[in-house]
A protein has these predicted regions:
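Hydrophobic/aromatic-enriched cytosolic interaction surfaces used to assemble or bind macromolecules
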Residues: 1-279
Length: 279
């Protein structure tokens, strides 16, 4: 993407938005071309073990090719435990109390909120305060969202196709997000640690049973970094007739990967859906 020579104060540069994706053990960055929205530079950053994500991000601002180009605007995707509250029941003054009551070990984090108008909910999630400070030191205009939010938005639109119930299973960062929609609301949404495919199958079928879905007519959709996809699909087919894998790569998206290691991971589905949702 030919933006290396753009001045940070130029109108074109000011329209450029940097995406920062932060999970427990991974960092990556993406920038779309403002003149060609589906052309994206993507840089996975090698995280050092033994130091915090905040410390890794400080180093990245010195070493990353994309971060060194300087930006005014940043959209930060945060992977942390998320609590979904119906908009009609949300009281901002109580968000810290209900979040800490639901999730332990988050006392040193800042609690963030994001209204999800399409799902009629408010997402509460958290970010380490040191990490938040590192980000705020580098950008004038920052927006924080939960990492899975663009996937929710994209797959909610997908759920309107046909009349059958659809259970979505998004795999990322050794986690499994399981969710389904009913009209314009979440019917179910939860996250599981899923290092192993056998555990993932158990969680999916457990949720399926709890929701009382129809094994002959309702549908399971798998997407993301799916472990042992062939085995998992076959295992699910023993219990559910309709199991599908969604494509991880959108045909219209042109990705220029910036990385010293050619074998490094591909752009995550959640970042891709950000650009596709805005198309």
């Amino acid at each position: 993407m030919p933006n290396d020579q753009l001045n940070t104060s130029s109108p074109v540069r000011q329209r450029v938005r940097l995406i920062i994706r932060i999970s427990q053990n991974a960092l990556s960055f993406a920038v779309g071309d403002p003149t060609a929205p589906l052309q994206v530079d993507y840089e996975p950053y090698p995280v050092r073990n033994g130091i915090s994500i905040a410390a890794n991000l400080r180093e990245a601002f010195k070493q990353s090719e994309l971060l060194n180009k300087k930006y005014n605007r940043a959209l930060v995707l945060i992977d942390s435990p998320v609590l979904l509250v119906p908009i009609s029941e949300f009281d901002e003054s109580e968000k810290e109390t209900i979040y800490h009551h639901t999730f332990s070990g988050m006392e040193g984090n800042a609690i963030l909120q994001q209204i999800l108008p399409d799902q009629n909910a408010v997402a509460l999630f958290s970010i380490n305060k040191d990490l938040k400070t590192v980000i705020e030191d580098h950008f004038d205009n920052i927006r924080f969202i939960h990492l899975v939010q663009p996937v929710w938005n994209y797959l909610q639109l997908h759920s309107f196709n046909g009349v059958r119930q659809k259970l979505y299973c998004y795999f990322h960062d050794k986690k499994l997000e399981v969710f389904t929609f009913e009209k314009k609301r979440f019917r179910f949404c939860n996250s599981f640690d899923a290092d192993h495919s056998h555990d993932a199958v158990y969680y999916i079928l457990y949720v399926w049973k709890q929701l009382g879905l129809d094994v002959q007519h309702d549908e399971i959709y798998l997407v993301g970094e799916i472990p042992e996809i062939e085995w998992m699909t076959e295992a699910l087919h023993h219990y559910v007739k309709k199991v599908f894998k969604l494509n991880n790569r959108f045909s219209g998206l042109q990705i220029n990967k910036i990385a010293s290691n050619p074998l490094t991971v591909n752009m995550p589905f959640d970042i891709q859906t950000l650009y596709i949702n805005e198309k």
